[in-house]
């Protein structure tokens, strides 16, 4: 493998270019945006980790009149457009602000973070304090914004003020770049101060409305919050979402780019596994890979050439959206989730104009959220051949990485929900050797589960072990016993008793009883109970057979 300087965690365009980091050329975005005549405000929504912040940093580097970045764009696609570069490269006053760090458990702490962001933004423009084109009243407000002592009114008006002052300073209208505009309201919705933060963000976005100092604005986020909620009164406003085609090649890696990356890194043999794990997003007319994942995996391959693909989304707080969805919808969406986890598609109505406070108001809103945040994607035509009604989309899980996240979440959800339900009748049936009631109680639990492995052995083993986890028992799964492996062993040392479970699964209902008998026979033949005879007063053995969401239990008392 060839060593490349992989910029994982670096979203600053200038840092990447100056330090010689590997860069996939997305400069065509500049020409695409400038080619949209008559558009004052462009909102671009994509899932997290698809290069939005890096793209915005590139725009700032290209337009900002305070910079001289011609060298950084040499050999990039945009440099071929000489007249455009003459007119626009480092010729326009530019404001770039990102709200992705604005978070807090309550409104006051989040508001403090926001005022810090505004303060740091104004520190980039200290020249305004010395300018004879800025009056003393405005200079005083600028000082207060820098110090973090400005009133709420002036904080809300800070972007409007900055564009006006820069217009006065340079005599040119200002380009305004706002990154991750929806993070503050998303965090606010999660922590119970949505209305307060929405009011602040509405104020900040007044810079987009009837602003003579504005040349144009580009805004990025995850969701297209309903215009009437946050962009009230904004004219000449267009949005570009994952259902559109115009800009989709600029966010995420298309196949030709991934092919070139793998060639440059000399890891073409990893193409199939990278496609399986990190491809599969169908945005507009483009199939794209998640760039965050591809770059992380390439970096890992440089450390360990034998490294297998893993989920790089797995340990992020954003994944809570799946859990909240399952918690809300519960058994109502079990069948749909099982279809998705089996590699199938489901058809749902999708609304791109959501507001965070209404995300949980309907099942459709939650499916829309999973789609817009990248946990589901639009199925390709070859993956779904049915006819779709207006406003509906055929959805599927994009790749192995996201499937693993769903599976992990489903397991945790089942474990948690099982712990909350009353299992005393089931436990009594186990220790009383009541296979009839045990069959009944297990069937009830099975109907509440979400299958994530096409009803194969590992699904049933996890189900069986999960029933007893967190209930005060010791649980062993697939431990070596006698001449083989029993599936699950449950220990109750306080009462000196142990229950041994051997599970079988069958593909037909009529074999349920015979497989149950086979499980009992296996316990006998392989002497699973023998090692417990000296240490426990009561040993109960159970054979269980499963068919989809049905089961049968039979018992064998070894020692009572």
Predicted features along the sequence, with ranges:
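Phosphate-binding site recognition
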Residues: 1-456, 471-473
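Structural signature of nuclease core domains in nucleic-acid processing machines
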Residues: 435-560
């Amino acid at each position: 493998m060839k060593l490349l300087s992989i910029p994982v965690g670096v979203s600053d365009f200038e840092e990447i270019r100056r330090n010689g980091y590997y860069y996939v050329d997305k400069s065509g975005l500049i020409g695409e945006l400038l080619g949209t005549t008559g558009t004052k405000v462009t909102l671009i929504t994509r899932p997290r980790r698809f290069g939005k912040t890096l793209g915005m940093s590139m725009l700032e580097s290209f337009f900002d009149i305070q910079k001289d970045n011609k060298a950084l764009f040499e050999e990039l696609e945009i440099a071929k457009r000489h007249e455009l570069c003459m007119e626009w490269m480092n010729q326009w006053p530019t404001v770039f602000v990102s709200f992705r760090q604005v978070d807090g458990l309550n409104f006051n702490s989040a508001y403090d973070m926001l005022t810090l962001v505004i303060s740091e933004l104004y520190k980039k423009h200290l020249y305004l304090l010395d300018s004879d084109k800025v009056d003393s009243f405005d200079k005083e407000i600028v000082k207060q914004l820098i110090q973090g002592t400005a009133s709420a009114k002036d904080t809300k008006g800070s972007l409007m003020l900055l564009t006006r002052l820069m217009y006065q300073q340079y005599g040119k209208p200002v380009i305004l770049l706002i990154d991750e505009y929806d993070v503050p309201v998303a965090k606010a919705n999660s922590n119970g101060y949505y209305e307060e933060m929405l009011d602040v963000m509405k104020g900040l976005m007044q810079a987009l409305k009837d602003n003579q100092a504005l040349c144009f604005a580009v805004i990025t986020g995850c969701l297209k919050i309903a215009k009437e909620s946050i962009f009230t009164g904004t004219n000449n406003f267009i949005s570009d979402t994952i259902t559109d085609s115009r800009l989709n090649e600029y966010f995420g890696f298309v196949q030709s780019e991934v092919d070139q990356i793998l060639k440059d890194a000399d890891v073409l043999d990893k193409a199939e596994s990278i496609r399986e794990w990190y491809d599969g997003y169908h945005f507009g007319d483009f199939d794209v890979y998640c760039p965050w994942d591809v770059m992380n995996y390439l970096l890992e391959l440089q450390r360990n050439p034998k490294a297998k693909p893993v989920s790089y989304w797995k340990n992020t707080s954003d994944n809570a959206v799946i859990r909240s969805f399952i918690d809300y919808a519960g058994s109502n969406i079990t069948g749909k989730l099982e279809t998705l986890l089996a590699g199938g598609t489901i058809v749902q109505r999708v609304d791109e104009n959501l507001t965070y406070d209404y995300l949980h108001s309907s099942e459709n809103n939650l499916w829309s959220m999973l789609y817009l945040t990248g946990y589901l994607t639009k199925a390709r035509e070859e993956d779904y051949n049915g006819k779709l009604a207006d406003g509906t989309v055929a959805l599927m899980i994009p790749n192995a990485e996201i499937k693993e996240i769903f599976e992990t979440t489903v397991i945790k959800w089942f474990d948690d929900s099982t712990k909350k339900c009353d299992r005393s009748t089931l436990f009594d049936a186990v220790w009383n050797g009541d296979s009839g009631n045990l069959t009944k109680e297990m069937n009830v639990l099975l109907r509440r589960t979400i299958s994530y492995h096409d009803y194969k052995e590992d699904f049933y083993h996890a189900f069986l072990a999960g029933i007893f986890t967190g209930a005060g028992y010791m649980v062993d799964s697939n431990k070596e016993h006698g001449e083989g492996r029993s599936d699950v062993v449950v220990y109750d040392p306080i009462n000196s008793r142990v229950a041994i479970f051997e599970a079988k699964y069958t593909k037909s209902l009529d074999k349920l009883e015979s497989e149950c008998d086979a499980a009992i026979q296996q316990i006998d033949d392989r002497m699973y109970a023998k090692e417990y005879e000296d240490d426990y007063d009561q040993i109960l053995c159970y054979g269980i057979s499963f068919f989809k969401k049905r089961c049968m239990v039979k018992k064998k008392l070894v020692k009572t």
